[in-house]
Protein backbone atom coordinates (compact mmCIF):
# COMPACT_ATOMS: atom_id res chain seq x y z
CA UNK A 1 0.00 0.00 0.00
CA UNK A 2 2.88 2.36 0.72
CA UNK A 3 4.26 2.04 -2.80
CA UNK A 4 0.92 3.10 -4.30
CA UNK A 5 0.81 6.14 -2.03
CA UNK A 6 4.36 7.09 -3.01
CA UNK A 7 3.41 6.95 -6.71
CA UNK A 8 0.26 9.01 -6.06
CA UNK A 9 2.36 11.55 -4.16
CA UNK A 10 4.81 11.73 -7.06
CA UNK A 11 2.01 12.23 -9.57
CA UNK A 12 0.49 14.98 -7.43
CA UNK A 13 3.90 16.63 -7.15
CA UNK A 14 4.43 16.58 -10.91
CA UNK A 15 0.96 18.03 -11.53
CA UNK A 16 1.59 20.75 -8.96
CA UNK A 17 4.94 21.69 -10.52
CA UNK A 18 3.18 21.97 -13.89
CA UNK A 19 0.58 24.27 -12.35
CA UNK A 20 3.15 26.42 -10.55
CA UNK A 21 5.04 26.98 -13.81
CA UNK A 22 1.96 28.32 -15.59
CA UNK A 23 1.21 32.00 -16.19
CA UNK A 24 -2.15 32.20 -14.45
CA UNK A 25 -2.07 33.36 -10.85
CA UNK A 26 -4.97 31.12 -9.83
CA UNK A 27 -3.25 28.06 -11.32
CA UNK A 28 -0.07 28.94 -9.42
CA UNK A 29 -2.03 29.12 -6.16
CA UNK A 30 -3.75 25.80 -6.87
CA UNK A 31 -0.36 24.29 -7.71
CA UNK A 32 1.11 25.33 -4.37
CA UNK A 33 -1.95 23.98 -2.58
CA UNK A 34 -1.65 20.69 -4.44
CA UNK A 35 2.05 20.57 -3.60
CA UNK A 36 1.27 20.84 0.11
CA UNK A 37 -1.25 18.01 -0.23
CA UNK A 38 1.35 15.87 -1.99
CA UNK A 39 3.88 16.58 0.76
CA UNK A 40 1.30 15.72 3.42
CA UNK A 41 0.49 12.44 1.69
CA UNK A 42 4.18 11.63 1.44
CA UNK A 43 4.78 12.38 5.13
CA UNK A 44 1.82 10.34 6.33
CA UNK A 45 2.96 7.45 4.13
CA UNK A 46 6.48 7.63 5.52
CA UNK A 47 4.98 7.59 9.01
CA UNK A 48 3.65 4.15 8.22
CA UNK A 49 0.28 2.87 7.09
CA UNK A 50 -0.12 0.26 9.78
CA UNK A 51 -3.00 -0.82 11.93
CA UNK A 52 -2.84 -0.35 15.65
CA UNK A 53 -4.56 1.25 18.58
CA UNK A 54 -4.37 4.77 19.88
CA UNK A 55 -1.19 5.56 21.81
CA UNK A 56 -2.76 5.16 25.23
CA UNK A 57 -0.96 2.49 27.17
CA UNK A 58 -3.31 -0.30 28.12
CA UNK A 59 -2.66 -3.86 29.13
CA UNK A 60 -2.81 -6.44 26.39
CA UNK A 61 -2.10 -4.10 23.49
CA UNK A 62 1.01 -4.86 21.49
CA UNK A 63 1.01 -2.39 18.59
CA UNK A 64 0.45 1.33 18.72
CA UNK A 65 0.16 3.92 15.97
CA UNK A 66 2.75 6.70 16.02
CA UNK A 67 0.88 9.99 16.67
CA UNK A 68 3.70 12.34 15.61
CA UNK A 69 3.13 12.17 11.80
CA UNK A 70 -0.60 12.63 12.29
CA UNK A 71 -0.10 15.70 14.48
CA UNK A 72 2.42 17.10 12.00
CA UNK A 73 0.03 16.62 9.08
CA UNK A 74 -2.87 18.17 10.98
CA UNK A 75 -0.77 21.26 11.68
CA UNK A 76 0.38 21.40 8.05
CA UNK A 77 -3.22 21.21 6.81
CA UNK A 78 -4.25 24.16 8.96
CA UNK A 79 -1.25 26.22 7.83
CA UNK A 80 -1.88 25.32 4.18
CA UNK A 81 -5.53 26.35 4.48
CA UNK A 82 -4.58 29.72 5.95
CA UNK A 83 -1.93 30.46 3.34
CA UNK A 84 -4.22 29.37 0.50
CA UNK A 85 -6.96 31.67 1.77
CA UNK A 86 -4.46 34.53 2.00
CA UNK A 87 -3.12 33.86 -1.51
CA UNK A 88 -6.65 33.74 -2.96
CA UNK A 89 -7.56 37.07 -1.38
CA UNK A 90 -4.28 38.54 -2.62
CA UNK A 91 -4.96 37.21 -6.13
CA UNK A 92 -8.48 38.65 -6.09
CA UNK A 93 -7.16 42.05 -5.02
CA UNK A 94 -4.45 41.89 -7.68
CA UNK A 95 -7.05 41.04 -10.33
CA UNK A 96 -9.22 43.97 -9.25
CA UNK A 97 -6.28 46.39 -9.40
CA UNK A 98 -4.59 45.18 -12.58
CA UNK A 99 -7.47 43.56 -14.48
CA UNK A 100 -5.53 40.37 -15.26
CA UNK A 101 -4.28 37.23 -13.57
CA UNK A 102 -1.49 36.66 -16.08
CA UNK A 103 1.84 37.07 -14.28
CA UNK A 104 3.59 38.06 -17.51
CA UNK A 105 1.34 41.10 -17.84
CA UNK A 106 1.84 42.12 -14.20
CA UNK A 107 5.42 43.23 -14.73
CA UNK A 108 6.09 46.91 -14.20
CA UNK A 109 7.51 49.11 -16.90
CA UNK A 110 11.30 49.70 -16.79
CA UNK A 111 10.65 53.46 -16.50
CA UNK A 112 8.90 52.92 -13.16
CA UNK A 113 12.09 51.58 -11.56
CA UNK A 114 14.15 54.71 -12.27
CA UNK A 115 12.03 57.10 -10.24
Swiss-Prot record:
Signal peptide start-end: none
Major place of residence: membrane
Keywords attached to this entry: Antiport, Cell membrane, Hydrogen ion transport, Ion transport, Membrane, Sodium, Sodium transport, Transmembrane, Transmembrane helix, Transport
Coiled-coil segments on the chain, per record: none
Keyword Transmembrane: yes
Highest taxon listed in the record's lineage: Bacteria
Membrane topology: Multi-pass membrane protein
Gene Ontology biological-process entries: proton transmembrane transport; sodium ion transport
Ranges annotated as spanning the membrane: 1-21, 28-48, 72-92
Disulfide bond in keyword set: no
GO cellular component terms, A-Z: plasma membrane
Protein's cellular compartments: Cell membrane
GO molecular function terms attached to this record: antiporter activity; monoatomic cation transmembrane transporter activity
Role: Mnh complex is a Na(+)/H(+) antiporter involved in Na(+) excretion.
Subunit structure and binding partners: May form a heterooligomeric complex that consists of seven subunits: mnhA1, mnhB1, mnhC1, mnhD1, mnhE1, mnhF1 and mnhG1.
Family of this protein: Belongs to the CPA3 antiporters (TC 2.A.63) subunit C family.
Protein's name according to its UniProt entry: Na(+)/H(+) antiporter subunit C1
Gene (UniProt): mnhC1
Amino acid sequence: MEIIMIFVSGILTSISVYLVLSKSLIRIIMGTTLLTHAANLFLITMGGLKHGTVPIFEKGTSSYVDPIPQALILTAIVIAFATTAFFLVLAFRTYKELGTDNVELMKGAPEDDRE
